[in-house]
């Protein structure tokens, strides 16, 4: 016998005082307690009573030297006509219960089992007599929710039996339904459970009463069809072995030609389809003209040399000179490099382009980084005012000019043949050109951070100009000027002017080209590419 009687439970005992007062009668003050004597009173916490005291309500009275049960406890109370006894039916039923638990009201119940039919019938009878459900709950020691549920079911269906009225729901996951669900899933792997339910109704497999729910279909797909869809070990052994995955298929997404195929042959197969040979080479089918290989010029090189063949280690290792030529093919066609060695020009190859090519980078380089299209020197003005027309730039190849200590070999062909260091006007062969407008001594240059020195300020230039004008003028130039400052200034100007109306040696009129050596190599202020950080 199982009785879970802990500290939280209540062991109901019969109050001897209440029973004695009920037996004494109204004269002894028992009229007020007569009704209460029929029920269990005074619950006491923490005290364990006997099985009968917890389940069998007895109304005891004192008489005959012992306690005896009152015969009218199960019947109506004299003070309350029509009110039946509180424990008229609970006594025999409780005696039949051999196991169970005790609820808060003191009644014995079995968890998970329905209430006995006799108690159900008694609840309905008491309700028909007009007793409130709360009073029925206290009298029969049944929870209020159970009483209300039984009465509501009786009012709706007229039945006091537990469980569903029409019986349990019939089985819906029949083998036929499972077979159709499997067929639907195999035909369309992405089908939803509610779509399967609609197709079962549309095909007449089920009707609206026995069609499985969406959750049932999902459970069938997960438990039954999911396990059946996976092939067994025997079925897996019959399948052909999968092709080995190439290690670089996920990088190169386009078809590859086979090394045994003819040179330049192209394949149109899909990347995942294996080719005729066991090895694959570099790609040949290019999606667009803006790929990385086209930008670097690899496609042009490959079209000239054909598809590379060989082992995987040598398929991607061309010679260095071929790659150097590949890098040049990406640029526009430019003039020849005049016999210079390729390694010497690898670092500066971008600067040997024509002026039109270099003008494209004008937004990224400073103004003094490259000369203008008609300018041969860095510190000179446009060359048309000083140089005679010559062959196009760069001219034919000439003898190399490589003075000792020069870092880069410069060939004479890179300098214009007509770019002499002695102007024809100073030699007297041609008339003097028109005078140019005079500007301040510090003239504008392409690089404002380095102002150009005044023209004619070098002693070597003045001495050479005086020797060219008159060999006997050196003594006059060395002697101090006699007279006022005005006379001395005029004498110096006349001495430096030279014969035949040559141009005066003023800073504004002095040309930019230095006599010797070449100014763009030996001038200390020349802005080379090394100074620009290239």
UniProtKB/Swiss-Prot annotation:
A GO biological-process term: skeletal system development
Keyword entries, A-Z: Activator, Deafness, Developmental protein, Disease variant, DNA-binding, Intellectual disability, Nucleus, Paired box, Transcription, Transcription regulation
DNA-binding region ranges: 98-224
Positions of transmembrane segments: none
Any one Gene Ontology cellular component term annotated for this protein: chromatin
InterPro entries: Homeodomain-like_sf, PAIRED_DNA-bd_dom, Paired_dom, PAX_fam, WH-like_DNA-bd_sf
CDD domains membership: PAX
Region PAI subdomain, annotated ranges: 101-157
Location of region: Disordered: 424-480, 492-511
Recorded disease: Otofaciocervical syndrome 2, with T-cell deficiency: An autosomal recessive disorder characterized by facial dysmorphism, cup-shaped low-set ears, preauricular fistulas, hearing loss, branchial defects, skeletal anomalies including vertebral defects, low-set clavicles, winged scapulae, sloping shoulders, and mild intellectual disability. Some patients also exhibit altered thymus development with T-cell immunodeficiency.
Protein name: Paired box protein Pax-1
Source organism of this protein record: Homo sapiens (Human)
Lineage: Eukaryota, Metazoa, Chordata, Craniata, Vertebrata
